[in-house]
Amino acid sequence: MSPAKTVGTLIMGIVNATPDSFSDGGRYLDAERAVAHALELVAHGAGVIDVGGESTRPGAERVPVEEETRRVLPVVTALAERGVVVSIDTMNAETAVAAVEAGARIVNDVSGGLADPGMLAAVAATSADFVLGHWRGPSSDMYARAAYADVARDVTVELSERLREAARAGMDPSRVVLDPGIGFGKTAEQNWAMLASLEHLVALGPRVLVGTSRKRFLTAALSDASAADSAPASAEEPSVARRDAATAVTSVLAERAGAWGVRVHDVAATRDALAISAAWRAGASWTA
């Protein structure tokens, strides 16, 4: 299956082969466990598995390329051998090329090629598609750069320029997927504003991937919703199940805005939400 030929909204399942990811750090650091989890996500409806070996959570420190490749290459190889469409989540050109050689068909760079100046040319020389994320700087101080005149307009303009840079590096625009970088260098309010105006980014033409899964701005919204609840549990941080439900809702809204794909931890919840959304739309053509 080519990710470009997917019918309906593609679900990209997340596999973090890291000890420090914000949501599931350490759970899938072992390659066998990571592969087993990835195959479970495929069984639940994931069309692509995104394998990462370096956390991009706020405040995360960079990982040496040698350690990153040690974490991800066995997982990429095993999944590709099983026919799974694999995406490599990396900001390093060396890791990207090694993963593509191991069978990855997509390179997902949250920095859009800014963290490693060699990334665009390196990916252009392969046959892989490229997810170009909106990025204003490293995770260690990303919120210091969250200044926008109009977040949706500014993100669209900045991604347009990165798209032109990718073309200048030799990458056909049809291979590029744009990611608005939800949770990267944006406040909670700016994340919501970007999502509410997602159709403007979609209108640029390239495919758009949206990743909201379990992110802090969802937790904040759920906590606000619980504030009026008199139960003692309302003061606790929202559970993973609640964050996954919130992710599924935002995934449906992204799909309705025209997103090509959504990147999530809980594939089954998002699959079901998208199925209900499709049935709702189809209801207009049903007869009593």
Could you tell me what each predicted segment is?
Residues 3-6, 23-37, 56-78, 85, ...:
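Active-site-adjacent loop and "lid" segments of alpha/beta metabolic enzymes
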Residues 16-20:
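Short polar catalytic/cofactor-binding loops
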Residues 8-13, 40-53:
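N-terminal glycine-rich anion-binding loops that anchor highly charged ligand groups
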